[in-house]
């Protein structure tokens, strides 16, 4: 299945994301950029998925490029709420530039992994022409899962926001 945000080529990736976030117990997002309005739109669902399992989001380009005050505050606020629910959940920032886009939904043994061009933003989810595809090959799924683990776990690549440090230099 491919999603391009065009009705004659799979439709909006945002609709696919919304459908899956309600069905699965775990979500990992790796995105270069994000939109405050997308964080706000999906905040309740992100918190619910953290209650059911785990919700981890890594943003890959802001350490070097910076963020607006509203972007910074939205990440800090969401991170605090996610960690309060589940310490395994949270917001991560890469210290090396990461521009890829991966969305992994999991429940029990079932995994859906999408890879493509959509950032976690309104333009990525509906208004830009993008190209995202569901990965069905089990070997590729395994490699992508390992890569996500690497992004989230390797301290030379990324760091989790610390809710006790609201002026964390990862967001400046």
What label would you give each PLM region?
Residues 1-172:
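PLD/PLD-like phosphodiesterase catalytic module centered on the HKD motif
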């Amino acid at each position: 299945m491919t999603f391009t945000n065009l009705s004659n080529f799979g439709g909006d990736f945002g609709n696919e994301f919304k459908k899956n976030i309600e069905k699965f117990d775990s979500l990992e997002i790796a995105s270069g950029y994000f939109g405050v309005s997308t964080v706000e739109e999906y905040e309740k669902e992100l918190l619910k998925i953290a209650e059911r399992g785990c919700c981890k989001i890594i943003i890959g380009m802001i350490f070097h490029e910076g963020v607006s005050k509203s972007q910074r505050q939205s990440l800090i606020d969401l991170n605090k709420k996610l960690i309060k629910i589940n310490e395994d959940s949270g917001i991560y920032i890469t210290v090396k530039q990461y521009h890829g886009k991966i969305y992994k939904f999991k429940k029990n043994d079932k995994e859906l992994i999408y890879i493509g061009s959509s950032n976690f933003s309104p333009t990525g989810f509906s208004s830009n022409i993008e190209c995202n595809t569901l990965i069905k090959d089990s070997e590729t799924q395994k490699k992508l899962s390992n890569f996500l683990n690497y992004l989230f776990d390797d301290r030379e690549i990324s760091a989790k926001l610390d809710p006790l440090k609201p002026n964390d230099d990862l967001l400046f």
